[in-house]
Structure formats: structure tokens, C-alpha cells
């Protein structure tokens, strides 16, 4: 079996031959990998376009990541900036725009190994929060990189709690300017990407003060560096925050402002305006100014959050069919480590999660596009549900993708600790997503507030609006309670309706429990804030169950749309079953708590779960192949399509500069140390 034509090889000595163990995995296909790739891409035409973009990117030496693992922080920054420069030139020449998919595919091909990514977030926030006049002025400048912009929200002393941001924007009616000021050291903007060395402008989130009144957080466009010589502008203290756990190519920065003045027109004014005399006009809800962050959060899901787990699964699964270790019987040869049930237990839940989260994120993106159009027209009906879905999905996906990528790394043993495996950089990059665009615990608790309100509405509590129908994502809260799981055999747990209902039951019970505890504290005399703080652990548990239920439900609904693809539907159903059952077994206490599941039924679920592992094993390589990552995109000695792990790992190690550079420590320390011992012999 040869390597498919669309796969751009690394061009090394091993790319032209397939490892026999890898070839055997692809010999008998139970489904069309190409067709599954098309489904994941949203159609064959999108697959073709993506591969065309990838061939352009990988055919250009300016985009090579060959020596990334041996580079210093400065070298990584320069390489990432070089790639952005050449990508922008290609985009201009080819006519690629944000309205098309080419730039999205280019980012995927480059594994987001680029600088100036915050330009896209700036533009999304501008379109969400800016007036038509502001968009007309600033969007062309951003699209063509006449300015380089970042999104500066997080401060040294505040992150997810936006109401606590300290940066102030005080309106001066005499000059019709806003005075942007960092009143304390903790008000210093801290962490924005591209701010440290690159940005010329920043979209600043600050507390608006006009006519002596505080009006909450609003967005302002603030120039920070000269467009002539890139020096900081007056009143601006700016720089790089220093080394980080990962993402070393990005210049995360700090920004302190000392009474910096910007024109009145620099406050984004789709949902709020300050008139020349200082009068404040509110055009949206209190949540409107969070829209820019919501837009960013939704668009991160498939790329920055899910993609690292998908890549980690590809690398670890491919390595697991090449690595032979231990015998199943004393007289047998060593087997592929993927034959071990424990290795399957490590990897297959992560693989199932990749597919579950893909369908969850694409479904959310569809809902977002519908709701976003309404919001821009100042119809905020869908905003609460969209906010809850986006925050919960981001929190759950980033939590599980981080845990899953680390699980894949550990499943590769010692080689997974090598940067050359590609796994450490995947782990550190996705770990960052647990805190950027909202710390996950805080996000879960925002979901919990939505659940409490929805539960009160469903049950007709005083003060609720029970006459209105519940949002679709929480409609299960109004369904009749299913007191007991009807499963009688292990095979019953292969029924999507059964395990989806089980997850709905647990999510509803935990939500009702959280409401009960909250109300009990209120009735005992606690005020609403104290009562909330004393029940946040229970609320957190309910929010997590709700989010997992949504992921199971969305996977089930995606399967129902694949009736014309029976082979693919069958193999994906196994992953859906595994995803649901893995969650049940991991959280079995929640299902046993009220007797919904019996101990015997948990045993049945475990039997069903273990029966799935050998079935998924047969298709594991094919299911990871369907993600269709090129070898350049993976940049892993362990995860190449051809499976030649050991040859490539040995060859890549030879490229380490330390193997050819003189070792100054030898003459300074090692030689004297050896000589001191020799003199005593």
C-alpha cells in the first residue's frame, strides 16, 4: 500500500516506504476513510480545498517547522512572524479572505505556529461591537496589516471577572476624548498575545466613566506603538511578560497606560454611545459588551482546543501499533502495545471524545451563526442560551482535551516526554486554553446560573417565567423524571436513547439538588450572595453533568444524520457508545446516588464498555487517519503516516545543535573534575 497522493511527505529517506505494521492496519477497511474525512470537513469540496491550501503551504520552504524543537524563544518568535508575513503575501496574491475557508485551512496546516493571531480576534470584536462607521474605518487597516492589533482584556490583577477590571476610560467633554489610564499596578494589561513586541494598536477593555458615573466595561481602540519606528507612544509602558510554560513563539505582553488620550470615536459603539456632551446612550443589554469574547470563544473550539487532542490521538495511536512490548503468552512474540487492553483504555476514550467534541463544536457553531445575526440586529433573545452553551462547551472541551492530550503523551512512554514526539508542545498549548477566554471553573459557574434560572422556570417557582418555553438545550429539565434505568442486559447500554436519557436524568437531578441547597440556605437567612458561594461545589457538579449530557446528545443527533452512510454510522456509533459509557463509569456515583442505576447495572455498563474496546481497536488507525493531518502539521517523529518511528526519531536527534557544537562546560567543569579525581588515584 502506497502513501496517498494528497499526503505531502516529509521528503526524508523513510517517507517512500510504509512500515509493515502500519500497512497491516490499513489493509482491510471497514469503512471509507476518505468519506469520513469529507464528513468531518463538511463536504468533499471542502476537503479538496483544504488539501490544495495545505499543498501550497507545505510546498513553500518559508513555512518549514523542521528545526522548531531546537530553537530559542527569540528564534521561535522570528520564525512565527516570518510565517505570518509570507502567509499574508500568499493570501493577498491568491485572494484568500476571512470570508472564505482558505486562511482557516492555512492556520491548520501551520498548526497555528504563527504570530499576529490576535489580529483576527481584534477584527471579530470590531465587527461585533463596532458601529458600521467604525468597521468601515478600522477593518481595512486590520485586514491588510496596515496596523497590527491585539485584544487587551486580562489584567495583572483580574482575568475572568470582567466587572473587576481596573483600567479606566474617563470621558473629557471639553476635548471630546477618552483618557485611558491604569490607576494601579494590578490594572496593567497582562497576557495579551502579540502585545509584547508586535502590536501597534490594542482593543482595550476598560471601565467607562462619563458625566461622573461608572458605566461598566466598554471597548476602546488605543494606539500603543508608533507606525513610523515602532517605539512606544507617550504614556505607554509596554513589553513582553517573559518565558511561559508553552507557546514560546507568541509575544504575550504587558501594557500600562498613563492618561493616554484617544478620540471619542475610538469607543466601539454598536451597543452603547457617549455623545459629545458626555451623555450615555445604551443600545444593548448589559451582556452586549461581552460579545467579542463570546465570538472568540466559539471560534477557538475546533482549532486551538480540539485540534491538539486530535493530533495527540493520531500520534499516540500510530506509535501504539509500531511499538512492540510484552507478550500476551510466554511463547508468543512481543505484541503491538495497542493490543493491550490498558492501552486501549488510555487512548480510545480520547479518540471518542475527539469525535464527540467535533460534532458538539460544529453544532454550536451553527447555532452561533443564527444567534449572532440576531444579536447584531439587537435581538438578544438567544444570547443567554448562546452564552451558556459557549462557556460550558469551552470549559468542558478545554478541560478534557488537556487531560486527554496528557494521557496520550503518557501512553507513549518515555518517547512521549521527548519534544520530538510533538506531544509536549500539544499538551502545553491546549493547557493554556483552560484559562484564556475565561477560567474554566468560573465558566462552569456561569452555566450553573443559567441552569438554576431554567430549573426555576421549569418548576414554576415564584419569580420565574414558567409560561415561556425553556431553551432547547435545557428542555430536559421540564421532562417527567425517569426514576430508574430500564437496562436489563449489557447490550441495553448500546442504546443511544437509553444512555442519553441517563445523562439527562443525572444532569437534571444535580441541577435540582443545587437549586434545593441554594433555596434552603436562603430560607435559613443567608443572603443570595452568601448562599451562592456556599453551594458552588454543587453547582459546579451540575454544570459539568449538563455539559457532558449536551456532548452525548449532540453525538447521538449527528449519528442520526448518517443513515445513508451505514458503515461510517456503525463505527461512529461505537465511539458514541464509548463516550457516553466512559462518562457514566467515571461518574458512577452520580448515577448510583438516587438509585437510578443499580450496582448490577453499573457492572452491565462496564461489560458493554469493555466489549467496545476490541471493536474500536480494529478501526483505530483508520479513525485517526480520517482527521487527515499531514506529517508536516503533526511535526512528530512518532506520528508520521508511514510509521517509521525509530529511524526518524534517531535521525531527528542527530539534528540537535548540541551534537555538533563545542561543549564549553567540558573545559570549565568536566575536565577539571575528572583531573581532580585522577590526581588522587
From Swiss-Prot:
Annotated PANTHER family: ELECTRON TRANSPORT OXIDOREDUCTASE, PEROXISOMAL ACYL-COENZYME A OXIDASE 2
InterPro entries documented for this protein: ACOX_C_alpha1, Acyl-CoA_ox_N, Acyl-CoA_Oxase/DH_mid-dom_sf, Acyl-CoA_oxidase, Acyl-CoA_oxidase_C, AcylCo_DH-like_C, AcylCoA_DH/ox_N_sf, AcylCoA_DH/oxidase_NM_dom_sf
Tissue: Liver and kidney.
Reaction(s) catalysed (UniProt annotation): (25R)-3alpha,7alpha,12alpha-trihydroxy-5beta-cholestan-26-oyl-CoA + A + H2O = (24R,25R)-3alpha,7alpha,12alpha,24-tetrahydroxy-5beta-cholestan-26-oyl-CoA + AH2; (25S)-3alpha,7alpha,12alpha-trihydroxy-5beta-cholestan-26-oyl-CoA + O2 = (24E)-3alpha,7alpha,12alpha-trihydroxy-5beta-cholest-24-en-26-oyl-CoA + H2O2
One GO term describing the cellular component: peroxisome
Gene3D superfamilies: Acyl-CoA dehydrogenase/oxidase, N-terminal domain (1.10.540.10), Butyryl-CoA Dehydrogenase, subunit A, domain 2 (2.40.110.10), Butyryl-CoA Dehydrogenase, subunit A, domain 3 (1.20.140.10)
Protein name per UniProt: Peroxisomal acyl-coenzyme A oxidase 2
Amino acid at each position: 500500500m502506497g502513501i496517498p497522493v494528497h499526503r505531502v511527505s516529509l521528503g526524508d529517506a523513510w517517507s517512500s516506504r510504509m512500515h509493515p505494521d502500519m500497512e497491516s492496519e490499513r489493509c482491510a477497511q471497514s469503512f471509507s476513510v476518505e468519506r469520513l474525512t469529507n464528513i468531518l470537513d463538511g463536504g468533499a469540496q471542502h476537503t479538496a480545498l483544504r488539501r490544495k491550501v495545505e499543498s501550497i503551504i507545505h510546498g513553500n520552504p518559508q513555512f518549514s517547522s523542521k528545526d522548531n524543537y531546537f530553537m530559542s524563544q527569540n528564534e521561535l518568535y522570528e520564525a512565527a512572524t516570518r510565517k505570518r508575513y509570507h502567509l499574508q503575501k500568499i493570501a493577498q496574491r491568491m485572494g484568500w479572505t476571512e470570508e472564505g475557508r482558505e486562511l482557516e485551512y492555512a492556520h491548520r496546516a501551520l498548526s497555528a505556529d504563527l504570530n499576529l493571531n490576535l489580529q483576527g480576534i481584534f477584527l471579530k470584536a470590531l465587527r461585533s461591537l463596532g458601529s458600521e462607521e467604525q468597521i468601515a474605518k478600522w477593518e481595512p487597516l486590520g485586514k491588510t496589516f496596515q496596523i497590527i492589533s491585539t485584544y487587551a482584556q486580562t489584567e495583572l490583577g483580574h482575568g475572568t471577572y470582567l466587572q473587576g477590571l481596573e483600567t479606566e476610560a474617563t470621558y473629557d467633554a471639553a476635548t471630546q476624548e477618552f483618557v485611558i489610564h491604569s490607576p494601579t499596578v494590578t490594572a496593567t494589561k497582562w497576557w495579551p498575545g502579540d502585545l509584547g513586541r508586535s502590536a501597534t494598536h490594542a482593543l482595550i477593555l476598560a471601565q467607562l466613566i462619563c458625566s461622573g458615573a461608572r458605566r461598566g466595561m466598554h471597548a476602546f481602540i488605543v494606539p500603543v506603538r508608533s507606525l513610523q519606528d515602532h517605539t512606544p507612544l507617550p504614556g505607554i509602558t509596554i513589553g513582553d511578560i517573559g518565558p511561559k510554560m508553552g507557546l514560546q513563539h507568541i509575544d504575550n505582553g504587558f501594557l500600562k497606560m498613563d492618561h493616554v488620550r484617544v478620540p471619542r470615536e475610538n469607543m466601539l459603539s454598536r451597543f452603547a454611545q457617549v455623545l459629545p456632551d458626555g451623555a450615555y446612550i445604551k443600545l444593548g443589554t448589559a451582556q452586549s459588551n461581552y460579545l467579542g469574547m463570546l465570538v472568540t470563544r466559539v471560534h477557538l473550539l475546533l482549532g486551538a482546543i480540539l485540534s491538539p487532542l486530535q493530533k495527540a490521538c493520531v500520534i499516540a495511536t500510530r506509535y501504539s501499533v509500531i511499538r512492540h512490548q510484552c507478550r500476551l503468552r510466554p511463547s508468543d512474540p512481543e505484541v503491538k502495545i495497542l493490543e493491550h487492553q490498558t492501552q486501549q483504555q488510555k487512548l480510545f476514550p480520547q479518540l471518542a471524545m475527539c469525535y464527540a467534541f467535533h460534532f458538539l463544536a460544529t453544532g454550536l457553531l451553527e447555532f452561533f451563526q443564527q444567534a449572532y445575526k440576531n444579536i447584531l440586529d439587537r435581538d438578544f433573545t438567544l444570547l443567554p442560551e448562546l452564552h451558556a452553551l459557549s462557556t460550558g462547551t469551552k470549559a468542558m472541551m478545554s478541560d478534557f482535551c488537556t487531560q486527554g492530550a496528557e494521557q496520550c503523551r503518557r501512553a507513549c512512554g518515555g518517547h512521549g516526554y521527548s519534544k520530538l514526539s510533538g506531544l509536549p508542545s500539544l499538551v502545553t498549548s491546549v493547557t493554556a486554553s483552560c484559562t484564556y477566554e475565561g477560567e474554566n471553573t468560573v465558566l462552569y459557574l456561569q452555566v450553573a446560573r443559567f441552569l438554576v434560572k431554567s430549573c426555576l422556570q421549569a418548576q414554576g417557582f415564584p419569580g420565574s417565567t414558567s409560561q415561556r418555553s425553556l431553551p432547547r438545550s435545557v428542555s430536559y429539565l421540564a421532562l417527567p423524571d425517569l426514576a430508574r434505568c430500564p437496562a436489563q442486559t449489557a447490550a441495553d447500554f448500546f442504546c443511544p436513547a437509553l444512555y442519553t436519557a441517563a445523562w439527562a436524568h443525572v444532569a437534571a437531578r444535580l441541577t435540582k439538588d443545587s437549586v434545593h441547597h441554594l433555596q434552603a440556605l436562603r430560607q435559613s437567612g443567608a443572603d443570595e450572595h452568601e448562599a451562592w458561594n456556599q453551594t458552588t461545589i454543587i453547582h459546579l457538579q451540575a454544570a459539568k453533568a449538563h455539559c457532558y449530557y449536551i456532548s452525548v446528545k449532540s453525538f447521538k443527533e449527528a449519528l442520526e444524520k448518517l443513515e445513508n452512510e451505514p458503515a461510517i454510522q456503525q463505527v461512529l456509533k461505537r465511539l458514541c457508545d464509548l463516550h457516553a459509557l466512559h462518562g457514566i463509569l467515571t461518574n458512577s456515583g452520580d448515577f448510583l446516588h438516587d438509585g437510578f442505576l443499580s450496582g448490577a447495572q453499573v457492572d452491565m455498563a462496564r461489560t458493554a464498555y469493555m466489549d467496545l474496546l476490541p471493536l474500536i481497536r480494529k478501526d483505530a488507525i483508520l479513525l485517526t487517519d480520517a482527521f487527515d493531518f499531514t506529517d508536516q502539521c503533526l511535526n512528530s517523529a512518532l506520528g508520521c503516516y508511514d510509521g517509521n518511528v525509530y529511524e526518524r526519531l534517531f535521525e531527528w536527534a542527530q539534528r540537535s545543535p548540541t551534537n555538533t557544537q563545542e561543549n564549553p562546560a567540558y573545559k570549565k567543569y568536566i575536565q577539571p573534575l575528572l583531573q581532580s579525581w585522577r590526581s588522587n588515584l
